[in-house]
């Protein structure tokens, strides 16, 4: 079972068990846990969250602390991507500890944050660093990273061009949709207007947000209780997106009821989908989706 990151500092696992000359890198917004990063040999660079007058590394504190602060003050948390300095440290440390290695950085959607731009500035002109926009976030980015990491473990002799080709194929096929747990976070952060927020509250509407070409797009609105709309999404989303049945990941925000999680797994298993794990949202996604969010990630056939 996949669980959230619990450490915000730069995590450099080295070559892991693969001994590949290619080392992967991603941001904490991918919601890859320290344990999984170690298994896959992925370096995690922290993104940042500002609340209570302090900017902190994503993953360095529990997401509940952020939720409690917002509940008490109504001051929305703000998120920011990795800085050029973050990548100077990350690239430098990885290459120093792994002489002769190459880095493949699979970036959090460049449409949503400055992280990739920061990395490009630092890596400019370097042939030992390759940067690819995953055009996804959270577990969508994680799924792409996992696919490349497993390919490298199976074929450690793989070239950087070959690994990049696998990444691009995965990026073209990955699909992600989620339902925010609390629209108040989207409204407070300026992601939805007050009018749209009030209308949704009055009518009991829950928007489905899909990641399309790196952008977060509201594609549909469900009506009813959170339990009802999540069950409906679980029935509709995988088939509507022609997801492969052998690899589905489920996303949940802190506070999503265990009974809802069990119901969703039952629905998907009845349809023949293999749930590979639950991914709990870290602070970057949770700052916008709030507690109790739900999402589905998979690869199109």
Outline where the language-model segments fall.
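An N-terminal domain-start capping segment
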Residues: 14-21, 90-94, 107-113, 191-197
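N-terminal glycine-rich anion-binding loop in soluble enzyme alpha/beta folds
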Residues: 22-86
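Short, Lys/Arg-enriched N-terminal segments with co-localized hydrophobic residues
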Residues: 2-18
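Mixed-charge interfacial surface used for oligomerization/domain docking
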Residues: 29-43, 48-50, 102, 115-130, ...
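Short beta-strand->loop
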Residues: 107-109, 132-135
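Short catalytic-loop micro-motif centered on adjacent basic/acidic residues
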Residues: 24-25, 78, 105, 131, ...
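Glycine-rich phosphate- or other oxyanion-binding loops that anchor nucleotides, phosphorylated ligands
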Residues: 73-110, 118, 164, 171-172
């Amino acid at each position: 079972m996949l669980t959230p990151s619990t450490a915000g500092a730069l995590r450099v696992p080295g070559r892991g068990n693969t001994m590949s000359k290619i080392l992967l890198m991603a941001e904490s917004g991918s919601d890859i846990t320290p344990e999984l990063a170690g298994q896959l040999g992925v370096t995690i660079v922290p993104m940042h969250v500002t609340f209570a007058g302090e900017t902190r590394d994503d993953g360095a504190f529990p997401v509940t602390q952020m939720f409690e602060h917002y509940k008490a003050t109504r001051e929305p948390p703000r998120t920011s991507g990795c800085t050029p300095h973050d990548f100077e440290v990350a690239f430098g440390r990885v290459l120093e500890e792994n002489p002769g290695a190459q880095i493949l950085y699979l970036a959090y959607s460049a449409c949503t944050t400055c992280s990739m731009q920061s990395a490009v500035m630092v890596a400019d002109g370097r042939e030992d660093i390759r940067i690819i926009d995953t055009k996804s976030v959270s577990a969508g980015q994680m799924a792409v990273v996992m696919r490349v990491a497993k390919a490298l473990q199976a074929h450690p002799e793989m070239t950087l061009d070959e690994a990049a080709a696998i990444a691009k194929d995965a990026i073209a096929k990955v699909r992600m949709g989620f339902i925010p747990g609390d629209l108040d976070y989207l409204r407070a952060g300026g992601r939805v207007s007050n009018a749209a927020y009030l209308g949704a509250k009055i009518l009991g509407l829950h928007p489905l947000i899909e990641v399309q070409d790196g952008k977060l797009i509201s594609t549909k609105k469900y009506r009813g209780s959170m339990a009802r709309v999540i069950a409906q999404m679980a029935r509709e989303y995988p088939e509507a997106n022609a997801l492969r049945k052998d690899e589905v990941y489920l996303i949940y925000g802190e506070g999503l009821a265990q009974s809802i999680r069990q119901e969703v797994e039952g629905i998907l298993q009845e349809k023949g989908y293999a749930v590979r794990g639950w991914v709990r949202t870290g602070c970057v996604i949770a700052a916008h989706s709030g507690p109790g969010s739900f999402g589905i990630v998979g690869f199109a056939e």
